[in-house]
C-alpha cells in the first residue's frame, strides 16, 4: 500500500532553459516550468550555490585555481627541473589526469580535483579551491550545505563520482523501499556531452530524449510507492555554441612584464583573472586585454551584483569577461576551444538554468541559490 511523501530533485548539469523549451523536455509530465538565473561563473561556483543557497562570496567557492603561493599544494614542483617535465609527455591529458589522481590521493583531497592545462612552472604560485567533498556534511563548513540540512532524515544524495546511469539506478532502488523522504539525484554527464555536441541538433535531441525517458521512469517509480510525490528537475546553467576564440596568452606574452613577478593571470575558458604583485602593471594589462575585443572588464559593482566580490580578492583583483560564445584558446583549462561553453553573463539567454516540476512551490525560484531553500523547507 502506498504511503508517505517523498521530495525528489533531479539535478542535470547544463540543462539550460533554452534547451528545455526548444525540445519541450519533460513537457508532458512536468507542467510547472520557469527559467532560473544562473550563478555567474562555472559549476565550481554554481554547484556550491545550489547546495548552500549562498553566493560564492559567502560559501567561498568560485573557480578551481587562485593565486596563493603560501598555501599552494604544488610548491614541490619548484624543485623539479623543466627537463624532467617535457611538454611532449606531461602536457598530455591522460598523463595530467593520472598525476591529478596521485596528487589528490597524496593530500587526501575528497573533492573534484584536476590539473587541467595549467603550465607546470605556474602551479607553485597557485592554490586549489575544491579540496573537500561538497556533497557530504561539513563539505562547505562553516556554511551549512544540503547534506547538513538533511542529516538525520531518510535521504539520498547521489555520489557525484558515479555515472548518471548508476545514480538513476541507485535512486530508483531507494524509492522502491517506500521509506525515502528526500532525494538529490546528481547527473553530471550531460554537461560534457553538450560541450562537445551543442552544435549538432540531432545528437542533442537524442540525448535529451534519453534523459527525459529516465526522468519519466523515475517519477513513475516514485508514484508507485508514495502517496505524495514532489518532483523537480533543476540545473545550474545552459550551454552556448562557440562563436570565436581569443588568444589572451599570446597578447600577454608580448608585454615587457613577468608572470609571477609584476602580474599573475589565470585564463579560464571565458574569463581572465588577474592579480598584481606590482600594481604598476595594472594599466598595461587592462589596456592589452581591452584591445583584444570580444569582452570587457567587470566593474566592482558588477562583481558585487554577481556575488563574487570577495573582500580579499581571492579569485582575482580584476576580471576580464568574454562575450557569449567567445573562448580563450589556449587557456589554462585547455589547449583548444570546445564547441560549447558556459560561464558568460548570467543575463545571457544561453546561460539560464531551469526549474521543471510536477508541483507548484510556495515560491518559484528566481536564482539557482533558491533551489537550496526549496529542498530544505519543511
PLM region spans:
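Active-site-proximal N-terminal segment of extracellular/periplasmic enzymes that hydrolyze or transfer
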Residues: 1-42
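His/Asp/Glu-rich, glycine-adjacent segments
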Residues: 54-198, 210, 283-284, 290-294, ...
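Short catalytic/ligand-binding loop motif for oxyanion handling, primarily in non-cytosolic enzymes
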Residues: 17-20, 58-60, 72, 192-195, ...
Amino acid at each position: 500500500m502506498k504511503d508517505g511523501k517523498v521530495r525528489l530533485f533531479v539535478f542535470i548539469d547544463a540543462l539550460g532553459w533554452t534547451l528545455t523549451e526548444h525540445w519541450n523536455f519533460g513537457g508532458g509530465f512536468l507542467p510547472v516550468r520557469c527559467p532560473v538565473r544562473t550563478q555567474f561563473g562555472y559549476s565550481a561556483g554554481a554547484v556550491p550555490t545550489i547546495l548552500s543557497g549562498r553566493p560564492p562570496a559567502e560559501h567561498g567557492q568560485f573557480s578551481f585555481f587562485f593565486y596563493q603561493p603560501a598555501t599552494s599544494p604544488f610548491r614541490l614542483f619548484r624543485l623539479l627541473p623543466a627537463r624532467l617535465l617535457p611538454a611532449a609527455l606531461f602536457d598530455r591529458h591522460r598523463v595530467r589526469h593520472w598525476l591529478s589522481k596521485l596528487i589528490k590521493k597524496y593530500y587526501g583531497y575528497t573533492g573534484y580535483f584536476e590539473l587541467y592545462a595549467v603550465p607546470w612552472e605556474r602551479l607553485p604560485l597557485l592554490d586549489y579551491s575544491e579540496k573537500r567533498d561538497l556533497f557530504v556534511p561539513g563539505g562547505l563548513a562553516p556554511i551549512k550545505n544540503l547534506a547538513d540540512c538533511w542529516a538525520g532524515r531518510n535521504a539520498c544524495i547521489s555520489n557525484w563520482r558515479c555515472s548518471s546511469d548508476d545514480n538513476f539506478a541507485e535512486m530508483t532502488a531507494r524509492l522502491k523501499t517506500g521509506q525515502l523522504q528526500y532525494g538529490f539525484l546528481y547527473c553530471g554527464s550531460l554537461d560534457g556531452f553538450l560541450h562537445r555536441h551543442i552544435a549538432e541538433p540531432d545528437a542533442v535531441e537524442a540525448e535529451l530524449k534519453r534523459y527525459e525517458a529516465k526522468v519519466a521512469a523515475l517519477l513513475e517509480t516514485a508514484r508507485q510507492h508514495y502517496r505524495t510525490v514532489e518532483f523537480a528537475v533543476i540545473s545550474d546553467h545552459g550551454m552556448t555554441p562557440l562563436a570565436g576564440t581569443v588568444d589572451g596568452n599570446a597578447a600577454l606574452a608580448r608585454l615587457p612584464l613577468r608572470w609571477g613577478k609584476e602580474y599573475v593571470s589565470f585564463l579560464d575558458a571565458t574569463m581572465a583573472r588577474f592579480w598584481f604583485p606590482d600594481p604598476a602593471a595594472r594599466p598595461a594589462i587592462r589596456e592589452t586585454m581591452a584591445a583584444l575585443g570580444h569582452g570587457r572588464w567587470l566593474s566592482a559593482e558588477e562583481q558585487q551584483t554577481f556575488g563574487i566580490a570577495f573582500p580579499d580578492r581571492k579569485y582575482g583583483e580584476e576580471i576580464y569577461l568574454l562575450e557569449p560564445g567567445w573562448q580563450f584558446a589556449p587557456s589554462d583549462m585547455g589547449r583548444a576551444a570546445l564547441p560549447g561553453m558556459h560561464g558568460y553573463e548570467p543575463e545571457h539567454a544561453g546561460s539560464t538554468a531551469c526549474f521543471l516540476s510536477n508541483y507548484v512551490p510556495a515560491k518559484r525560484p528566481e536564482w539557482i541559490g533558491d533551489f537550496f531553500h526549496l529542498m530544505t523547507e519543511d
